[in-house]
Curated annotation (Swiss-Prot):
Keywords: Antibiotic resistance, Antiport, Cell inner membrane, Cell membrane, Ion transport, Membrane, Transmembrane, Transmembrane helix, Transport. Its main location: membrane. It is found in: Cell inner membrane. Multidrug efflux pump that functions as an H(+)/drug antiporter. Confers resistance to benzalkonium chloride, fluoroquinolones, ethidium bromide, acriflavine and tetraphenylphosphonium chloride. One of its GO terms (biological process) is monoatomic ion transport. The keyword Methyltransferase does not apply. The chain crosses the membrane at residues 21-41, 56-76, 104-124, 133-153, 171-191, 202-222, 253-273, 286-306, 326-346, 360-380, 398-418, 431-451. Belongs to the multi antimicrobial extrusion (MATE) (TC 2.A.66.1) family. This is Multidrug resistance protein PmpM. The lineage of its organism: Bacteria, Pseudomonadati, Pseudomonadota, Gammaproteobacteria, Pseudomonadales. It is a multi-pass membrane protein.
Length: 477
């Protein structure tokens, strides 16, 4: 008669874990939406200056955003390592770790900014950009390049606060950055308040300025809030330590490469579609923009799962870590069911929000169908990747991601969309079908990898427990 107690207990446990995940994920999601909104504001304000300015900003985005994701992705290892130390109750050990991560940011932030500053012109040349757009695009990119050092330092501090389970600072500063971006854009694009009239390139200098504001704001917050004092982050100082920075790079660089691979494949598909009819290009951009917006929620869940898995592993609870990953993936799938259903039902209305042109609406609506289809695989792969970051299992994840996107998705999409190898070329539909295949492949491989990693950690923990018990029994004799 007591059998119903177990399901009830499990149900309460699921609800408690889901509450923890959503509490972590909600501020992250708002911060990500604020960042996305900054890009939207840039596009609107540059577009009001002229189509020429908007084109320059769009070209610049195709260069700096993948590079930015590579840089910040490399620093994401800080979240998992801080989360594990926090879960283990090792607050004093967190400070030295984060200080070494800041040294790493001081290296790759300026280096990434220098690469963006000096290599943007050759990249634009390889892209065969119209000569009249090169100058404005370069000016736009140089403003952003000056903000890269601040962005790297900010992301380390953000990973630190997120790893402690404190996600509110990134939300507040994300909203603050958005609110500051608008007046700076207004001043630099249109030449108000005594500032030079820069047009679209002013967006880049505004973004670079906001990056510095967000870093200084996070630095002030972490330095003043009492919750962070136990880590003694700024009370001591050490030179760079290879023994600490090496593992950060070993875990973080594969994350950066995987994120770069995922973002760059969308850029490549945009370039492949760029040679087609302008209505096709517009429809593709609408579907892609809306897909990126919808992706923010499972992405935020994935970051929250990283923290929860890290906390549980640090506390010596590998079964709870696996449980947190499972609840996170179930929540992501539940969201995918809702988002996919709404996208299928409202695809034409969604497209009409972006354009009044019937031809563009028809193309965008047809592509949103494929976006709805990959909601499930996209939600699974990003949540599984977040859980694997919590396990600090990133190298194999990177290989799987590269293979899924570049070894499966892109070749399938290219074959179906732009060649007659299997049928008449279907244009953007074929390329989006390739995305569905690639994301599905990534989801399957990452879920299998996650199950194996979770099982391995549980076995290792149980083996250590048995060894400790045997050692204790020997000493007790």
């Amino acid at each position: 008669m007591n059998s119903p107690a177990l399901p009830l207990s499990r149900g309460l446990r699921i609800r408690a874990e889901l509450k923890e995940l959503l509490t972590l994920a909600a501020p992250i999601m708002i911060a990500q939406l604020a960042t996305t909104a900054m890009g939207f504001v840039d596009a609107v304000m540059a577009g009001r200056a002229s189509p020429h300015d908007l084109a320059a900003v769009a070209l610049g985005n195709s260069i700096w955003i993948p590079m930015f994701l590579l840089m910040t992705g490399t620093l994401l290892a800080t979240t998992a390592k801080v989360a594990q130390r926090h879960g283990a109750g090792d607050q004093p050990g967190t400070g030295p770790l984060v200080r070494q991560a800041l040294w790493l940011a001081l290296l790759i932030g300026p280096l990434s900014g220098a690469v963006l500053w000096w290599l943007s012109e050759p990249i634009l040349g390889l892209m065969k950009v119209r000569p009249e757009l090169i100058g404005p695009s370069l000016l736009y990119l140089k403003g952003i390049a000056l903000g890269f050092p601040a962005a790297a330092l900010y992301h380390v501090l953000r990973c630190y606060t997120n790893g402690l389970g404190r996600t509110r600072p990134s939300m507040v500063l994300g909203i603050g950055g958005l609110l500051l971006n608008i007046p700076i854009n207004y001043a630099l694009i249109y030449g108000h308040f005594g500032m030079p009239k820069m047009g679209g390139p002013g967006c880049g200098w505004a973004t670079g300025s906001v990056m510095w504001f967000m870093f200084l704001g996070m630095l002030f917050w972490v330095n003043k809030a009492s919750i962070y004092r136990a880590s003694q982050l700024f009370s001591r100082w050490e030179w760079p330590d290879r023994a600490t920075i090496g593992p950060l790079v070993a875990v973080g660089l594969p994350i950066g490469i995987a994120v770069f691979a995922e973002s760059s494949i969308f850029s490549v598909i945009a370039l492949l579609i760029g040679g087609l009819d302008e209505n096709v290009v517009a429809g593709h951009q609408i579907a892609l923009n809306f897909s990126a917006l919808v992706f923010m929620i499972p992405y935020s869940l994935g970051m929250a799962v990283t923290v929860r898995v890290g906390h549980n592993l640090g506390a010596g609870l590998p079964r709870d870590a696996r449980f947190a990953a499972g609840v996170g993936m179930a929540a992501a799938l539940g969201y995918a069911c809702v988002s996919a259903s709404l996208m299928l039902l409202l695809r034409e209305q969604i497209a009409a929000m972006y354009s009044p042109d019937p031809a563009v609406i028809a193309i965008a609506a047809s592509l949103i169908v494929f976006s709805a289809l990959f909601q499930f695989s996209d939600a699974l792969q990003v949540t599984a990747a977040g859980a694997l970051r919590g396990y600090q299992d990133t190298r194999v994840t990177m290989i799987m991601t590269l293979f899924a996107y570049w070894g499966i998705g892109l070749p399938v999409g290219y074959s179906l969309g732009l060649t007659d190898w299997f049928q008449e070329p279907t244009g953007p539909r074929g390329l989006w079908q390739g995305l569905v295949v690639g994301l599905t492949g990534a989801a399957i491989m990452l879920c299998i990898r996650l199950a194996r990693s979770a099982r391995r950690f549980i076995r290792q923990h149980e083996r250590l427990q048995r060894e400790d018990a045997e050692a204790a029994s020997v000493l007790g004799r």
